[in-house]
Regions:
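Catalytic phosphate/metal-binding cores of nucleic-acid and nucleotide-processing enzymes, i.e., regions
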Residues: 1-131
Length: 131
């Protein structure tokens, strides 16, 4: 049951991303990492700058999940952890900056899914303008 719940969670988060990309008019699609059990890696692939891990589990182990997310990312990637329990909205943990007068220290942040997608839209626009 737990593996099925995990796969279902991965599909939900993949679909959230793909709906977002369609709404933004972007030709990007995320897929589940089918090789993760054999060779490791994060759960969703398709954007090289993100390492997305998904946890849909009743036994809450946020510290362990975050460590796994950090360990599976590659240099230059942003670690992103989507997590939730049954009947609770998805939450997102990632590295972000909190504006604090003249300094913007990077730290672990926990945000709502809508805020994550606002960040992702801004990030994709900035990457496009660099091309």
């Amino acid at each position: 049951m737990s593996k099925q719940k995990g796969k279902r969670g991965e599909r939900e988060v993949k679909d959230l991303h793909n709906e977002f990309f369609i709404d933004q008019g972007l030709d990007i699609r995320l897929e589940r990492n089918q090789m993760q059990s054999a060779v490791g890696g994060y759960d969703l692939v398709g954007l090289d700058f993100l390492a997305i891990e998904v946890k849909h589990c009743e036994v809450f182990q946020l510290t362990k999940w975050w460590a796994q997310t950090m360990n599976q990312m590659k240099d230059g990637q942003t670690p992103v952890l989507f997590y939730r329990r049954n009947r609770v909205p998805w939450r997102v943990m990632m590295i972000g900056c909190v504006i604090n007068s003249d300094k913007q220290p990077a730290m672990i942040i926990d945000i709502a899914v809508d805020d994550y997608f606002r960040w992702l839209a801004t990030k994709l626009r900035s990457l496009k303008s660099e091309d």
